[in-house]
């Protein structure tokens, strides 16, 4: 885990208040399903980073889907950033899911993943790795 400055590749509004953010990955570290990214905003009044779950990772790009929580919020500020903007992130954060353990507990090879709301995006990356 390290703090780094990265470039936004895209930050698209995909549904009411929901955004799909993709950033460059400039580290040799591998992001695992279940880990997250701390995003530091440019506004010095917002000191705490915004933790956003990783939705996908291909070794060169990190993809996150997040909800803007309303006017004046940190995620509202983040939703205004666009392609080419630079942001500071700390990533990957957290332990991630125990993929091999999950595979070992599969009954008949089937695994059911459950999530709700903004908890669904991290399931996408987990499903790809299972």
Kindly give the residue locations of the regions a language model identified.
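Ferredoxin-reductase
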Residues: 2-83
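FNR/FR-type flavoprotein reductase catalytic core
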Residues: 73-130
